[in-house]
Amino acid sequence: LDSIKNKIKEYKLQDNVNLVGTVNENQKNYIFSNTDLMIMPTLDESSAKSIEGFGIAYIEAANFKIPSIASNIGGTPEAVIHNKTGLIIKDIDELDEAIKSLIDNKENRLKLGQNAKIRAENQLNWDIQIKKYNDLIKEIE
């Protein structure tokens, strides 16, 4: 987190970047309504037997047409598809490059956000996921 805060200061982005913790539903909707880019990198904690799950926050952002920058860890590559609904990064240097590229290329940022929303609506909504699980359970029975 300190390295991210340092990059924010280095590029003088304090007025444009907010690192937020836990928020309620109304706060979340307000934040997403005023957000251009979801940045949620994850550390590899596999040695501690802690793996990032699917990443519901990426889908919540997608519902607001917000593309995401995510790490290639755990289930996040299933939530964010590289160069289609956002960008997948390997390390802090790629995070820096990904942020710059989506800030500088508004057209691509908007395209990724639109793709993310379409995917969230058509493939990742709760009704579709519940049906998939029900079908799987019926198949096993």
Regions found by a protein language model. Give the residues of each.
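Acidic donor-binding loop of glycosyltransferase active sites
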Residues: 33-51, 66
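Short hydrophobic beta-strand element within catalytic cores of glycosyltransferases
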Residues: 58, 62-63, 67-70, 80
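A short, well-ordered alpha-helix in the C-terminal region of glycosyltransferases
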Residues: 101, 108-123, 129-135
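Short alpha-helical donor nucleotide-sugar binding micro-motif in glycosyltransferases
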Residues: 22-23, 30-35
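Nucleotide-activated donor-binding/catalytic signature segment of Leloir-type glycosyltransferases, i.e.
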Residues: 3-26
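Conserved acidic donor-binding segment of nucleotide-sugar-dependent glycosyltransferases
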Residues: 82-93, 101-107
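Short acidic active-site motifs
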Residues: 26-27, 94
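Short acidic/histidine- and often glycine-rich active-site loop of Leloir-type glycosyltransferases
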Residues: 49, 70-83, 87-89
